[in-house]
């Protein structure tokens, strides 16, 4: 049985799961956090760092040598500094959170004169290489003040892949096979067949060349190529007539001979008959070694070697020639004894390479190299050196080509080698044996006679011959995950390579001019590459911060898009489809609807990546039908060999599989196997789904399409004012809330010392206090009312009280959408399924007014508005309250600096920050001239450019931040903000110090009370120190005590030192903070001052808002009805929401109905507990009832709740927390059965049918039949009508067409499109149509005139020429057709 933590004891979920949990839900952000930790290797000592991340990138680029080789720059190590600003300061100031990277490099200069490369001198130095972004504890990055997430990428693994064109290339439908070697970086190498069965190669998808050119470039001759790919038949030529064949019987199979095949006198095969496997066996039994065949049997065969006249040295025939009768005669004449021919046939030994050699124009290695050079660099004149270098650099140098460990492992496995290790370049025995540099010699020594390129071609020809299969590129063994760390490393390497080029140039000057490493290295390219990646890469995304679940899901997302991946347009159906290998690795449900469907996936709950980046999923081992608790992670490649049972396979008490045949998966198929043949078993029923899908209760009763919508819409739920835990959950709510990082969890156990709304102070347990200056106090500052990326409100509320004893990991404070440490996305609403006057037609939702009154779905949104004062050509803009032509009333919310007060309630159009801009001299109107004459000059030289509240927004100002450029005097408001911030920090530090001091004195007291003193204030020698004496003593005088006991004396001295050390440390930290607060801000060029105003907007639920359950049952609120009109139950309780029952059957999401039944039972049980508490029943009675709920029929110990762990007080506290309903957990695919739901309804004294009689609120009459009623967890989604509703008055126009812009952001109009024009034409409403097409759109004069007419009170219009017609005329003129309009 589990023991419960302090938080969990407050409220326990009843679990309906039948399966024992073998594995806890892992840390959900591990894929991000671990990946980046390996990239930085920050806490690893420099000499122990693995070949990963920054270290690997630096090692691969250094050492850099000069062109002459007389100077080199070597890499020693690196270290990361401390970040200047912490996360909170970066968010506030709009900076990036990162740390400086300092790399130690060594400049070595060699002596030119010496022949042995003697070192002249060495200089070692630290070089700054830019800022490296740091990851926050929650797996995000702060870039320019906003939180971003780097999404992992699922890309095609490096290695070799075999495929065919599915018969699409050639009209005959013939399958053309191809192979492709994909490196991690470097050129792709393709091999492909053409319809005539010749074999070609392509480099980097360029034009194709016969494959023999590539082999010739490697150094192979025709004879060697043929010997590699074909077996050889040897024929002995008789001097006069006939030929003897050295017989290998197997090679005759399938042939038809035109002569009898006999063993001595016995004919085995008659002429004209096909030779079968039976004949072959007979031949083998007979032991026939040679076969006499006629000459015409040899004619037409292909020679495997050149044939030379032994006496004269004359070439009689070339390898790969077809033997003709003349040649045969020449062989006889020259006395050639034997010739070799290629063994080919049409069945399974195609003459592919032989065909290829016939179309190959080259004869020598040099010609082949030149041909490749021409293909890669068309138009450049080839030289021998250039051609050789180009070819070598393509596949054989570590700088340009890298298969990577993954690629090498996949390559070796695919071509059938046992060893998974090897070189990261392509190796070829022939090519490297001919080179004589050190690197080549090493390779030849290590790998002897293997050849990567030859083996790929061999496997390809085998597949073409019908032996072997092509690969499935959507198999997860062929796709790997690239996470943050790896992508950052690649980008960093790219930056370093750019630096390398510049350094090489300068190194030659280094020795003559005595340059230092710092002068050699320019860090800009590295910094720029990293900044570009984190700021604007396709995979660096603005974090979805709607609620905790959306954050977690965003970080666990796996995308097939992005650099080096697919594009939406090119991706076909196969890539997007669910593949059998997705099981337990990638969620089969959660993916976006729309163009990205299937390209963006989510990791399954238990999935993780292995060292190669392939996804693995855990399984329990099964031995001879016995299931163990040993867990093994398998990748898709390894899983192929095993038979795997489902998590719910039946087992007995001894963990033996009980069924005669167990449902299993094997190689992507589902089948039944006896227990003895099962190797593994799933760990958990929710293994296949992602976090979001695992939060949907009764998911197993929902159609997959609706489950997908349900999983996706949970991510859009807006955090409500008061979160409510779901009555029906799945049991992983706590894990999601914990790992999302929105709650505050205790880092160490202890006692709550002090608490207020904004922070919690914990005095740490003695046992957990570290040594040194650790004083054993943890201070947690809570986040109050800050804005998320999606403008929702992030706020944390304390859950503990002073004196509570907490353990490590306990939840101290709730964040948005969490309730006592559990994820709580919506509210539990009483729902009835019935039509109601057409107000819930087509998925509309009918709400009760009570929901609005109780603020159940009221959400707070925080809008950030920014006002920037710039330096303009005509002078600086100024932020002030002195604005021309504005009434006093409009300024009454501003202070003397022109900035709005905190707490002011503002509406659309109100001034928030007063700002004036100098304006140039312009033509004055007569009225302005008059004003000038009367009032003098001042009125006209500035214009009002204040920040106003945008249309459609109103709210309360909750925060103002003023940023001032360095060297510009701060205004009064900025100084006030600064002072209050300094005060806050000072109070924080003072409190910390006070608590630390108290803790130190308390420890000291325990060490000296009762000990004998030698002297001190008012103490004689030999007196004993007492508590009362210490209480009367000033704290600072404690250190005057002289103790007899040495330990006590030491304790006093130690305490004094500790306090002094802390005092110093706090002073230094406070000075640092103060400096940061008072320093000027780093603003964009030309900006003098920036003011940010934060508005809190309260949004109540209203018609037009989108809501949804967790089963894809979404709808729009159609009406809010008074409570008294809503249907009500016999108890008088009216329902909150009425949904249409027709939304259920066709969509097949029955999970919502089961949720409603179980939710009703949960609420009913809560009501019973409430009645018990109100009647002040005995605790034993409550204990018995809770035991009935939690432990009635649970066979599995894991879910039994051991109520004996709870004291009476804790039990009453638990009871109080259950009044709102007893939360239930029905895990995915392992949930509550119908019988269990019925039992719960019975226990709650509710009808087992889950239906009850409702009465019409308006008439009081009973409805015709009973209605399904119950509680459902219902969400309000972030698609609010307030954000979408919009109306244009007068706004901006498009520059060219002069038509109004579109969209709310541009304050645009509504498009009157072609269909609407047709409608008016059909009605014959000519004048309305003219008005729409001219003055209401783009007739500039007409619309100005109309405006004037309306001002003058004349309501008439004159339509002129629309601007778009002028555009048309201009476009026609651009085609050189003149068009003029005549009156």
UniProtKB/Swiss-Prot annotation:
Biological process terms in GO annotation: DNA-templated transcription
Catalyzed reaction equations: RNA(n) + a ribonucleoside 5'-triphosphate = RNA(n+1) + diphosphate
Keywords: DNA-directed RNA polymerase, Nucleotidyltransferase, Transcription, Transferase
UniProt-listed Enzyme Commission number(s): 2.7.7.6
Listed Gene3D superfamilies: 2.40.50.100, 2.40.50.150, 3.90.1100.10, DNA-directed RNA polymerase, beta subunit, external 1 domain (2.30.150.10), DNA-directed RNA polymerase, subunit 2, domain 6 (2.40.270.10), RNA polymerase alpha subunit dimerisation domain (3.90.1800.10), RNA polymerase Rpb2, domain 2 (3.90.1110.10)
CDD domains: RNA_pol_B_RPB2 (cd00653)
Keyword Transferase attached: yes
Enzyme class: transferase
Cellular component terms (Gene Ontology): DNA-directed RNA polymerase complex
Family matches, as Pfam families: RNA_pol_Rpb2_1, RNA_pol_Rpb2_2, RNA_pol_Rpb2_3, RNA_pol_Rpb2_45, RNA_pol_Rpb2_6, RNA_pol_Rpb2_7
Matching InterPro entries: DNA-dir_RNA_pol_bsu_ext_1_sf, DNA-dir_RNA_pol_bsu_external_1, DNA-dir_RNA_pol_su2, DNA-dir_RNAP_su2_dom, DNA-dir_RNAP_su2_hyb_sf, RNA_pol_bsu_bac, RNA_pol_bsu_CS, RNA_pol_bsu_protrusion
SUPFAM superfamilies: beta and beta-prime subunits of DNA dependent RNA-polymerase (SSF64484)
Superkingdom, natural source: Bacteria
UniProt GO MF annotations: DNA binding; DNA-directed RNA polymerase activity; ribonucleoside binding
HAMAP family reported in the protein's UniProt record: RNApol_bact_RpoB
Physiological role: DNA-dependent RNA polymerase catalyzes the transcription of DNA into RNA using the four ribonucleoside triphosphates as substrates.
Subunit architecture: The RNAP catalytic core consists of 2 alpha, 1 beta, 1 beta' and 1 omega subunit. When a sigma factor is associated with the core the holoenzyme is formed, which can initiate transcription.
Family: Belongs to the RNA polymerase beta chain family.
Protein name: DNA-directed RNA polymerase subunit beta
């Amino acid at each position: 049985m589990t023991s419960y933590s302090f938080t969990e004891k407050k409220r326990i979920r009843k679990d309906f799961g039948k399966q024992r949990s073998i594995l806890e839900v892992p840390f959900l952000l591990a894929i991000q956090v671990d990946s980046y930790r390996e990239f930085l290797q920050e806490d690893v000592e420099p000499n122990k760092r693995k070949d990963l991340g920054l270290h690997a990138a630096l090692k691969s680029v250094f050492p850099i040598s000069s062109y002459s080789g007389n100077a080199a720059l070597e890499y020693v190590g690196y270290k990361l500094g401390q970040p200047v600003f912490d996360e909170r300061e970066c968010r506030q100031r709009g900076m990036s959170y990162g740390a400086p990277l300092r790399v130690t490099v060594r400049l070595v200069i060699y002596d030119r004169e010496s022949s042995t490369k003697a070192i002249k001198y060495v200089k070692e130095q630290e070089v700054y290489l830019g800022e490296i972004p740091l990851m926050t504890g929650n797996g995000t990055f702060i870039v320019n003040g906003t939180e971003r997430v780097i999404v992992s990428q699922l890309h095609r693994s490096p290695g070799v892949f075999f495929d065919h064109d599915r018969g699409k290339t050639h009209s005959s439908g013939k399958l053309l096979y191809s192979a492709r070697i994909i490196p991690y970086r470097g050129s792709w190498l393709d091999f492909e067949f053409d319809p005539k069965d010749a074999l070609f190669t392509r480099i980097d998808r360029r034009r194709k060349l016969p494959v023999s050119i590539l082999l010739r470039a490697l150094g192979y001759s025709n004879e060697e190529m043929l010997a590699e790919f074909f077996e050889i038949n040897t024929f002995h030529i008789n001097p006069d007539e006939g030929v003897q064949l050295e017989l290998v019987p197997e090679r005759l199979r399938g042939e038809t001979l035109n002569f009898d095949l006999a063993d001595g006198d016995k004919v085995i095969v008659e002429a004209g008959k096909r030779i079968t496997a039976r004949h072959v066996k007979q031949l083998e039994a007979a032991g026939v070694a040679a076969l006499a065949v006629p000459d015409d049997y040899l004619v037409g065969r292909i020679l495997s070697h050149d044939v030379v006249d032994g006496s004269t040295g004359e070439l009689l025939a070339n390898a790969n020639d077809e033997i003709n009768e003349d040649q045969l005669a020449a062989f006889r004449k020259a006395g050639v004894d034997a010739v070799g021919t290629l063994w080919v046939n049409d069945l399974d030994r195609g003459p592919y390479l032989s065909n290829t050699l016939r179309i190959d124009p080259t004869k020598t290695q040099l010609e082949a190299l030149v041909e490749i050079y021409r293909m890669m660099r068309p138009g450049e004149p080839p030289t021998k050196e250039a051609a050789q270098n180009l070819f070598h650099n393509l596949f054989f140098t570590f700088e340009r080509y890298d298969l990577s460990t993954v690629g090498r492992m996949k390559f070796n496995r695919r071509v059938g080698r046992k060893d998974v290790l090897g070189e990261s370049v392509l190796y070829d025995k022939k090519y490297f044996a001919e080179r004589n540099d050190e690197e080549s010699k090493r390779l030849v020594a290590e790998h002897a006679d293997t050849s990567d390129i030859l083996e790929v071609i061999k496997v390809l020809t085998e597949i073409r011959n019908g032996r072997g299969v092509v690969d499935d590129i959507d198999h997860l063994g062929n796709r790997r995950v690239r996470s943050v760390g790896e992508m950052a490393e690649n980008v960093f390497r790219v930056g370093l390579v750019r630096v390398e080029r510049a350094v090489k140039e300068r190194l030659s000057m280094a020795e003559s001019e005595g340059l230092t490493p710092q002068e050699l290295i320019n860090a800009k390219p590295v910094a720029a590459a990293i900044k570009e990646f984190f700021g604007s890469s396709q995979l660096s995304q603005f974090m979805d911060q709607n609620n905790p679940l959306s954050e977690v899901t965003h970080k666990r997302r796996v995308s097939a898009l992005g650099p080096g991946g697919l594009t939406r347009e090119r991706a076909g159906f196969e890539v997007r489809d669910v593949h059998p290998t997705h099981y337990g690795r990638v969620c089969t449900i959660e993916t976006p609807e729309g163009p990205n469907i299937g390209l963006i996936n989510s990791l399954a709950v238990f999935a993780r990546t292995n060292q190669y980046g392939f996804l693995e999923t855990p399984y329990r081992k099964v031995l001879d039908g016995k299931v163990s608790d040993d867990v093994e992670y398998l990748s898709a490649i390894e899983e192929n060999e095993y038979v795997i049972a489902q998590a719910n396979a039946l087992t007995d008490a001894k963990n033996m599989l009980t069924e005669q045949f167990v449902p299993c998966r094997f190689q992507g198929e589902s089948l039944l196997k006896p227990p003895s043949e099962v190797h593994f078993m799933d760990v958990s029923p929710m293994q296949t789904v992602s976090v979001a899908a695992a939060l949907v209760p009764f998911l197993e009763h929902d159609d997959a399409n609706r489950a997908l919508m349900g999983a996706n819409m949970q991510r859009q739920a807006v955090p409500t004012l008061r979160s409510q835990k779901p009555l029906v959950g799945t049991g992983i709510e706590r894990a999601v809330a914990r790992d999302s990082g929105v709650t505050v969890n205790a880092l160490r156990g202890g006692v709550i010392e002090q608490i207020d709304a904004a922070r919690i102070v914990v005095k740490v347990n003695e046992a957990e206090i570290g040594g040194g200056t650790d004083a054993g106090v943890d201070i947690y500052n809570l986040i109050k009312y800050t804005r998320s990326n999606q403008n929702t409100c992030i706020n944390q509320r304390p859950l503990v009280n002073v004196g509570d004893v907490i353990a490590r990991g306990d939840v101290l404070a709730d964040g948005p959408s969490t309730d006592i440490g559990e994820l709580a996305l919506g509210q539990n609403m009483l729902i009835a399924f019935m039509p109601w006057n057409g107000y819930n037609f087509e998925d509309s939702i009918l709400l009760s007014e009570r929901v609005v009154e109780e603020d159940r779905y009221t959400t707070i949104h925080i809008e950030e508005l920014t006002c920037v004062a710039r330096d303009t050509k005509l002078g600086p803009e100024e932020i002030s309250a002195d604005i021309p032509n504005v009434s006093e009333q409009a300024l009454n919310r501003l202070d003397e600096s022109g900035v709005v007060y905190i707490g002011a309630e503002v509406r659309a159009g109100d001034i928030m920050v007063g700002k004036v801009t100098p304006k140039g001299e312009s033509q004055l109107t007569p009225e302005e001239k008059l004003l000038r004459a009367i009032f003098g000059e001042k009125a006209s030289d500035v214009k009002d450019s204040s920040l106003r509240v945008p249309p459609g927004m109103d709210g309360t100002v909750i925060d103002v931040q003023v940023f001032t450029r360095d060297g510009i005097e701060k205004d009064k408001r900025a100084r006030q903000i600064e002072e209050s911030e300094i005060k806050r920090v000072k109070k924080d530090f003072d409190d910390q110090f006070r608590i630390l001091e108290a803790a130190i004195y308390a420890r000291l007291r325990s060490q000296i009370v009762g000990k004998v003193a030698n002297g001190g204030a008012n103490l004689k020698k030999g007196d004993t120190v007492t508590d009362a004496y210490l209480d009367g003593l000033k704290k600072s005088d404690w250190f005057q005590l002289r103790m007899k006991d040495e330990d006590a004396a030491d304790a006093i001295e130690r305490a004094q030192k500790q306090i002094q050390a802390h005092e110093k440390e706090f002073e230094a930290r406070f000075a640092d903070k103060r400096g940061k607060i008072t320093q000027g801000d780093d603003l964009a060029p030309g900006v003098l001052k920036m003011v940010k105003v934060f508005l809190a907007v309260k949004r109540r639920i209203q018609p037009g808002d989108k809501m949804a359950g967790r089963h894809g049952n979404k709808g729009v609120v159609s009406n809010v009805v008074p409570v008294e009109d809503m249907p009500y139950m016999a108890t008088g309780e009216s329902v909150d929401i009425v949904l249409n029952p027709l939304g259920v059957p066709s969509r097949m999401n029955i999970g919502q109905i089961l949720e409603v039944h179980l939710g009703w039972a949960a609420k009913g049980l809560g009501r019973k507990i409430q009645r018990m508490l109100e009647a002040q029943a005995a605790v034993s009675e409550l204990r018995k009832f809770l035991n009935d709920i939690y432990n009635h029929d649970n066979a599995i110990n894991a879910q039994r709740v051991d109520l004996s762990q709870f004291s009476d007080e804790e039990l009453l506290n638990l009871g109080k927390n259950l009044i709102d309903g007893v939360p239930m957990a029905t895990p995915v695919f392992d949930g509550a059965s119908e019988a269990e739901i019925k039992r719960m309804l019975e226990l709650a004294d509710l009808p087992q049918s889950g239906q009850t009689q409702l009465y019409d609120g308006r008439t009081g009459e009973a409805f015709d039949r009973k209605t399904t009623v119950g509680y459902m967890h219902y969400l309000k989604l972030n698609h609010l009508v307030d954000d979408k509703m919009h109306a244009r008055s007068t706004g901006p126009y498009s520059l060219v067409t002069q038509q109004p812009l579109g969209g709310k952001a541009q304050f645009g109009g509504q498009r009157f499109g072609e269909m609407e024009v047709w409608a008016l034409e059909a009605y014959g409403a000519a004048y309305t149509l003219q008005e729409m097409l001219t003055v209401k759109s783009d007739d500039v004069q007409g619309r100005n005139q109309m405006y004037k007419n309306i001002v003058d009170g004349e309501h008439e219009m004159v339509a002129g020429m629309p601007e778009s017609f002028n555009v048309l005329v201009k476009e026609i003129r651009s085609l050189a057709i003149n068009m003029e309009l005549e009156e």
